[in-house]
Amino acid sequence: MAAMAPGGGGSGSGVNPFLSDSDEDDDEVAATEDRRAGLRLGAGVGLDPGSAGSLSPQDPMALGSSARPGLAVEMSAAPAALGGSGETPARLSIDAIAAQLLRDQYLLTALELHTELLESGRELPRLRDYFSNPGNFERQSGTPPGMGAPGIPGASIVGGAGGREPSTTSGGGQLNRAGSISTLDSLDFARYSDDGNRETDERVAVLEFELRKAKETIQALRANLTKAAEHEVPLQERKNYKSSPEIQEPIKPLEKRALNFLVNEFLLKNNYKLTSITFSDENDDQDFELWDDVGLNIPKPPDLLQLYRDFGNHQVTGKDLVDVASGVDEDELEALTPILGNVPPTLDTPLPIENTLLVQKLEDKISLLNNEKWSLMEQIRRLESEMDILKAEHFATPAVGDSVQPSLVWSSQKDSEDNRQSPAVNSSDQEKTKDVHLEIPDAADSFIPKENSSGSFPRKEREELPPSSVSNKTTLHFDQPNRKLSPAFHQALLSFCRMSADSRLGSEVSRIADSEKSVMLMLGRCLPHIVPNVLLAKREELIPLILCTACLHPEPKERDQLLHILFNLIKRPDDEQRQMILTGCVAFARHVGPTRVEAELLPQCWEQINHKYPERRLLVAESCGALAPYLPKEIRSSLVLSMLQQMLMEDKADLVREAVIKSLGIIMGYIDDPDKYQQGFELLLSALGDPSERVVSATHQVFLPAYAAWTTELGNLQSHLIPTLLNKIEKLLREGEHGLDEHKLHMYLSALQSLIPSLFALVLQNAPFSSKAKLHGEVPHIEVTRFPRPMSPLQDVSTIIGSREQLAVLLQLYDYQLEHEGTTGWESLLWVVNQLLPQLIEIVGKINVTSTACVHEFSRFFWRLCRTFGKIFTNTKVKPQFQEILRLSEENIDSSAGNGVLTKATVPIYATGVLTCYIQEEDRKLLVGFLEDVMTLLSLSHAPLDSLKASFVELGANPAYHELLLTVLWYGVVHTSALVRCTAARMFELLVKGVNETLVAQRVVPALITLSSDPEISVRIATIPAFGTIMETVIQRELLERVKMQLASFLEDPQYQDQHSLHTEVIRTFGRVGPNAEPRFRDEFVIPHLHKLALVNNLQIVDSKKLDIATHLFEAYSALSCCFISEDLMVNHFLPGLRCLRTDMEHLSPEHEVILSSMIKECEQKVENKTVQEPPGSMSIAASLVSEDTKTKFLNKMGQLTTSGAMLANVFQRKK
């Protein structure tokens, strides 16, 4: 007899040792153990409820002696009741007697015992707790053990023992509480109290408690009625249904009420009010105002419109079907054959001989098919075992795809053979893969065969089968998407599932046992590792055991609990632990099939979608992708897609969203519902715009290539996806006239760049020669540098095509077609040439050429496009379109041409994105010639040089092009036009910063010195910024001296004395390079010459020139004031120069004069501090701090120069 606490269940009180962060409390566990101990009678003396010495309903004398518990409870008065021995038995505790009475439902006896104990002042907690809980009197109670069954005398005997009979002896009905009976929890003890002040309050509390209990009673009763209504079918309908099983199953009362409610709701929503009133009158037994009238604990379904719309998304089957190998019981055939053979030839049985022969033929065919089936299943098992071994030795994550595909192939082959050869089996659908179904009564029967189960094998046949055949009695089929992805692409996509099979534990997890023998072997392998490692850090050792049990257990509730344990095994699983759990989930899914994966595994994911720990949510996101191949296709494209979309939009953890993106990519590899295309596109845009760089990177590596593959199959790559992205870029450029959103531009353009491999694969697959691409003979070689390095395996063209060998054959035919046969009839390539390229070139012309980031992005895009499509395509299709637009010719040079296409971003993008794709000699010559022509045309037309500068900046970032750029500049140095020479001199400034000092010494400085002696003064002036940049970046003493000498000649040569533009350029250069130049050059050359220029400017009589020089001097002094300046230099040059400048600004710019006065005062204070505190030539720490403070103040105030003079007058005043 099972020991059960009153009102409790027998299986729900156990403590699960596998849960790491369960909600069980230590107090609850202790209480459970106390209850268990209290259920044993005489626990202290070894008595058991089932022993002869226990108090049980079968012992009337014992009950009679215990009917008055107020007396001394001695068992010596009834020796016969204790087995008839003359020995005095042990004394029983009152608590043990009370427990036995409650367990056997002797409630009246127990109540009298409780009353007498209260009267004697010895209240028993067990009885007090039991009778104070009204719930104990409202549940349905069955017949107690040993009671109510015919032939057991205990019932009548106890019934006559003082009238203390259990209420259930008269039937198994409810023990309802009556309103007139006061239970102990509702007794008004205030009536018996001397203190009457609290009587009202206590009565109110008791009444509130009574009301709450009454509501709970009503709710429980209605729940019972709801369940009863679900299963209640009128007798006549049941008879009709049994006699005619082809008729639809009759409607249940609960279903009828639910449908009535939904129909009435639909009528009201659509203004069919009169119809609704009539409908309500015809169903007057139902309240249409409240759903609870239908069923209290039944959730309300969506409205009829939603149900109708959602109907097409689900495949409705009448019965639970599972793909199993069909068989016929040999015993039945043997019993059937003689009966058929003995049928006499009558009119009612025509052609008996033919029927008998037909049956015999069918028997023979079934026997042959069964033999063939078992041999194939044995072969499948052997091959899978070999694959598991190879996978454990050689592969890690990618091995999962390998292990799935062969089994699917064998299953589909075997099924197709069964469909062709066996007329006795039924096909459940007419899709591409026809599955053979055998109907079974319960899901558990498909895993634990029973003798009488219709889905189990006959006893005789099971005994004769080889051991492996039993374990493979079910052939599972997973929904294969109607997709055309190459196996290589599929394999690369599945490689993003985070699973592990390259370790001992990983191989155990991926090799789930599916028979009793295998379970034993698994336990033998795993237990030695589990026993010492039950700590939290090693909980993953339990995964094989949990999975095996969950796979084979017949009870759905237990399986659900085990899978719950699996997902909650580790509180915050790390990366390795998550991989192990995922590997186990995939292995579980492969063994149980898509139906159980959907019903058992997916809910575990859904429960943790909003878990507080990101590691748990990460596990959910990763499991959605890992389980995608094993789910029904309707679930893949609906529930799983919605889960991932919710996590992408709502989850705040970057790692979780990254995993979501990878899982979305895997889903996109399996989805085949065209209606989900737009939803996928919206998810793509959301992922590309994610603020996390990790998420964006995962989008380009996984999601975008997988989505592009699906888009290609739907025919939307060239018709929707790429054009939509291009239109978004154009819209950005139109709206960005006053400020371009460069982040969004980068987002869309990078997406286009990631689509280039998919576009090229589409061009190859739809080429006129695609049917000729057969692998035979020697496969041509593909150069390593033929394609740009892909961001991920999914962007590798060979992966998209299927294999590197197939790609090599296609490339050979592709080049031949372009070179000799042209593009006639090649629609996919003509779209690239006639629509994509012109639109791209038009977009390029709208880009702001001064935006370095935009120029760089488009340059990289064209570079990848040209490298992917090949050299022949670039030379024959891309370059001619650019050249047609640019039209580099000196014949039509005029000033208006400066506003043309040469000044736009088309020039740098063509130079850096197209002409640099290939680096053979002829390609380099073409690039040099193009840059020389652009430099010449821009110079001669007096156009802005921004496009040329952008080209030099982009190319100068790569040292491989430094020599080439110097060649272009030398062409300008020796050009006959002074305008071109002047442009070349200015370009040297851009090139010097990135060129190594050897090239500067050998190529740059000689060219600049040549230009510095040019006959044209404008050319000489144009060299000054380049000389200044050399002073700023070069550290070789010899080079610095040469530059210093050249600059000194500009400043000290009498021929330049009146050259206002030269002085302006020198001062501007000094202000730019002075703070970063070598200190000795700054102290000995820059500051003294600025002092001289300030003195000369005092003598200038032209106010416009004086103001121009003064303004540039002010900017130069402002920049140099932040540098360390020695005391001598401060006194002899810096302060005198500032005073000269202030003299000029007093009349020309009073607002500048205020700031200069403050600067002079600060500098004088620094000099005074040095003189007082430190010997000459040194500087104290305090003075240094004052100097730094002055610099900070000055820089903060410099930003206010553009404000009014009145405000500037107060900028540097002391605070009072």
Curated annotation (Swiss-Prot):
Chain positions found as N-acetylalanine: A2
InterPro entries: ARM-like (IPR011989), ARM-type_fold (IPR016024), HEAT_type_2 (IPR021133), LisH (IPR006594), RELCH (IPR040362)
Compositional bias (Acidic residues): 21-31
Modified residues (Phosphothreonine): T32, T183
Coiled coil: 197-231, 358-397
Statement: the UniProt record of this protein carries the keyword Lipid biosynthesis: no
Subcellular location: Recycling endosome; Golgi apparatus, trans-Golgi network
Biological process annotations from GO: intracellular cholesterol transport
Residue positions where Phosphoserine is found in the record: S20, S22, S54, S56, S180, S182, S186, S385, S453, S792, S1149
Biased composition (Gly residues): 1-13
HEAT repeat start and end residues: 601-639, 640-679, 1004-1042
Comp. bias intervals (Low complexity): 142-154
UniProt-annotated stretches for the region Disordered: 1-67, 133-179, 409-473
Keywords: Acetylation, Coiled coil, Endosome, Golgi apparatus, Lipid transport, Phosphoprotein, Repeat, Transport
Compositional bias (Basic and acidic residues): 429-440
LisH domain: residues covered: 255-287
Region (Interaction with RAB11A and RAB11B): 497-779
GO cellular component: recycling endosome; trans-Golgi network
PANTHER family: RAB11-BINDING PROTEIN RELCH (PTHR32059:SF0)
Function: Regulates intracellular cholesterol distribution from recycling endosomes to the trans-Golgi network through interactions with RAB11 and OSBP. Functions in membrane tethering and promotes OSBP-mediated cholesterol transfer between RAB11-bound recycling endosomes and OSBP-bound Golgi-like membranes.
Subunit structure: Interacts with RAB11A (VIA-GTP form). Interacts with RAB11B. Interacts (via the third HEAT repeat) with OSBP (via C-terminus). Found in a complex composed of RELCH, OSBP1 and RAB11A.
Protein name as catalogued: RAB11-binding protein RELCH
Species for this entry: Mus musculus (Mouse)
